[in-house]
């Protein structure tokens, strides 16, 4: 019950009345979901957060009936009346309240409503900008309301799970120092310190490590992360993550903790099932070799196979040249495609080209032979070897990409996911969690000609690889781990560096000298000199997890007030200009780009 006898609006919610309440006088408050006139009676479906209750208005109650005749969708009302059973045959099994209705004896219109810009009582396609502009109305729709309520249940479960394991929830500052972590910082000018700026945190990374130095040992926070980066896919300038850190911990301990949390969330809060328990663990190298991605979807097969050795000795120059140039030839076999037309094959080739491939070679297993435009370049023995390498059965298609490894992996990964969707290979009710571990600590940025951290600069190398920092840093493996489910990265974490000398060495490898390190990270380096314990953690994204569990196409559908893909808040019209007076107070003058570049 969410009201009381003295509450002037409601004694009950619109979702709680049952047959056991028959004969009771109740008050309900909410919105007019639908209104129908039948045989002289008016039927109103009254909706609130908890559900819908049918209310009837009898013409014998003249004034109340007249008021009901004027009701329109989304008017806010309060109704008083008696709970009665619905006439036999008129029950609605689709509603928890479907056995009863309320015979209204009084009606108060609390607020009328303009005609909404879209229907709220029906799930019909609506332009996304309109939905975001009127988000407060969009959130009244059942699917959106359920998304937000489910998100709340997930966050509550996380808090309870971690509290039971002695974690302490600590809020870290939102106004902090600018130390870019791969994306641009959002900057906040200081009025009290002219020409100086705070930054909004891209993550609480340094603060949570400092909390480990402070001795809290087990910390978590439902944290906001803000990044001024180019918007693509389902990224948002601000998102929510479970930020977590532990002292005196190991990679295994972090993985087991999160594995237990995610398994419980899925099994206790959803109807989905966890496909593999315990979660499989794949090294980064293994994931790339088998799936062409460090975010593999394990709900289906279509694994990649390396046929470079076969290609090296073949008569097919495209394959042979790629291998001789230091690249590779890999392929996958797919059944269930039937006869593919030239147009369909061109479409698959285009999918591969989106990953950078210059082409897509194809063969089809027919009987004991292979058919296709490149089959003539392979002997019968080579054809049999290719077929065996890919595990192709009669009728299967075999697709190959020959190029540098990054291009081969990206192209075949795109093709694999395209075939997944085309053939319906993935069970939507299954969650195939897996851990990706042993990432390289560094990668080489060819455009800028320098070494960069693959994840971030605070990651501890594997102990046995520390000597390689001086001789071959690109060969160093980091104590890094990602959690992936159904091809979506849900979390990223690592064991952290806790020694100042080692942290400075990593800084120097990525081009941060001692002076810059002191300026940007001096507090952290100083803290490490005071007996900093070994520590590690992880930061699962709340938005992506809820998106996955609710089968939504993007994270905007599970956020109350998201930005557009162009990083605009359509509802509040932000970002927006500020007054000259505000700028003067902050000692800021504007140097704007040309008009055509100002509003993307």
UniProtKB/Swiss-Prot annotation:
Q: Name one GO molecular function term.
A: aspartate-tRNA(Asn) ligase activity
Catalyzed reactions per annotation? tRNA(Asx) + L-aspartate + ATP = L-aspartyl-tRNA(Asx) + AMP + diphosphate
Q: Where does L-aspartate bind?
A: 181, 227, 455, 496
UniProt-listed InterPro entries: Aa-tRNA-synt_II (IPR004364), aa-tRNA-synth_II (IPR006195), aa-tRNA-synth_II/BPL/LPL (IPR045864), Asp-tRNA-ligase_1 (IPR004524), Asp-tRNA-ligase_1_N (IPR047089), Asp/Asn-tRNA-synth_IIb (IPR002312), AspRS_core (IPR047090), GAD-like_sf (IPR004115)
Query: Where the protein is mainly located, per its record?
Result: cytoplasm
Location comes to: Cytoplasm
Superkingdom of origin:
Bacteria
An example of a Gene Ontology cellular component annotation for this protein is: cytoplasm
For the ligand (ATP), the binding residues are 227-229, 236, 489, 541-544
Q: What is any Pfam family matched here?
A: tRNA-synt_2
Q: What is its EC number?
A: 6.1.1.23
Q: Which GO terms describe its biological process?
A: aspartyl-tRNA aminoacylation
Q: Where are the transmembrane segments?
A: none
The cross-references to SUPFAM superfamilies, in alphabetical order and at most eight, read: Class II aaRS and biotin synthetases (SSF55681), GAD domain-like (SSF55261), Nucleic acid-binding proteins (SSF50249)
Question: Record's family?
Answer: Belongs to the class-II aminoacyl-tRNA synthetase family. Type 1 subfamily.
Q: What does this protein do?
A: Aspartyl-tRNA synthetase with relaxed tRNA specificity since it is able to aspartylate not only its cognate tRNA(Asp) but also tRNA(Asn). Reaction proceeds in two steps: L-aspartate is first activated by ATP to form Asp-AMP and then transferred to the acceptor end of tRNA(Asp/Asn).
Protein name, UniProt field: Aspartate--tRNA(Asp/Asn) ligase
Q: Which organism is it from?
A: Rubrobacter xylanophilus (strain DSM 9941 / JCM 11954 / NBRC 16129 / PRD-1)
């Amino acid at each position: 019950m969410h009201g009381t006898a003295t509450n002037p609006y409601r004694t009950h919610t619109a979702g709680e009345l049952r047959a056991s309440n028959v004969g009771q006088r109740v008050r309900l408050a909410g919105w007019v979901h639908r209104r129908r006139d039948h045989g002289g009676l008016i039927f109103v479906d009254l909706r609130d957060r908890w559900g819908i209750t049918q209310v009837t208005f009898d013409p014998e109650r003249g004034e109340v009936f007249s008021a009901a005749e004027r009701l329109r969708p989304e008017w806010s009302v309060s109704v008083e009346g008696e709970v009665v059973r619905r006439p036999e045959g008129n029950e609605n099994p689709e509603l928890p309240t479907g056995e009863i209705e309320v015979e209204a004896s009084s009606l108060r219109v609390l607020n009328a409503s303009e005609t909404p810009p879209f229907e709220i009582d029906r799930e019909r396609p609506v332009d996304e900008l309109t939905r975001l502009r009127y988000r407060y109305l969009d959130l009244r729709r059942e699917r959106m309301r359920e998304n937000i309520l489910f998100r709340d249940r997930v966050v509550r479960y996380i808090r309870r799970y971690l509290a039971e394991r002695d974690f302490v929830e600590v809020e870290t500052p939102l106004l902090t120092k600018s130390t870019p972590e791969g994306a641009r910082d959002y900057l906040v000018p200081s009025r009290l310190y002219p020409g100086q700026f705070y930054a909004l945190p891209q993550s609480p990374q340094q603060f949570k490590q400092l909390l480990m130095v402070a001795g809290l040992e087990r910390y978590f926070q439902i944290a906001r992360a803000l990044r001024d980066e180019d918007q693509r896919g389902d990224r948002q300038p601000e998102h929510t993550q479970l930020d977590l850190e532990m002292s005196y911990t190991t990679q295994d301990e972090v993985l087991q903790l999160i594995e237990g949390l995610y398994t419980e969330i899925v099994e206790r809060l959803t109807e989905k099932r966890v496909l593999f328990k315990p979660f499989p663990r794949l090294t980064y190298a293994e994931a790339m070799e088998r799936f062409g991605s460090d975010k593999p979807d394990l709900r289906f097969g279509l694994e990649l196979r390396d046929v470079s050795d076969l290609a090296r000795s073949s008569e097919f120059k495209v394959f042979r040249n790629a291998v001789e140039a230091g690249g590779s030839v890999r392929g996958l076999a797919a059944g269930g495609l039937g006869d593919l037309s030239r147009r369909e094959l061109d479409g698959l080739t285009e999918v591969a080209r989106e990953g950078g491939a210059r082409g897509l070679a194809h063969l089809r297993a027919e009987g004991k032979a292979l058919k296709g435009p490149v089959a003539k370049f392979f002997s019968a023995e080579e054809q049999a070897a290719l077929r065996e390498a890919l595990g192709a059965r009669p009728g299967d298609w075999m697709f190959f990409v020959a190029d540098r490894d990054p291009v081969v992996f990206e192209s075949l990964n795109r093709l694999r996911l395209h075939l997944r969707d085309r053939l319906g290979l993935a069970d939507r009710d299954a969650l195939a969690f897996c851990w990706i571990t042993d990432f390289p600590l560094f990668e080489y940025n060819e455009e800028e000609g320098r070494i960069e951290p693959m994840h971030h600069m605070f990651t501890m190398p594997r102990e046995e690889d520390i000597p390689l920092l001086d001789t071959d840093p690109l060969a160093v493996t980091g104590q890094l781990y990602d959690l992936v489910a159904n091809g979506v990265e849900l979390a990223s974490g690592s064991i952290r560096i806790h020694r100042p000398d080692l942290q400075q060495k990593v800084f120097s490898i990525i081009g941060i000298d001692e002076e810059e390190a002191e300026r940007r990270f001096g507090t952290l380096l100083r803290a490490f000199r005071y007996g900093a314990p070994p520590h590690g953690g992880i930061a699962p994204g709340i938005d992506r997890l809820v998106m996955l569990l609710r089968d939504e196409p993007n994270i905007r559908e599970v956020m109350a007030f998201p930005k557009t893909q162009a990083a605009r808040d359509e509802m509040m019209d932000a970002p927006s200009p500020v007054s000259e007076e505000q700028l003067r107070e902050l000692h800021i003058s504007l140097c704007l780009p040309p008009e055509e570049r100002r509003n993307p």
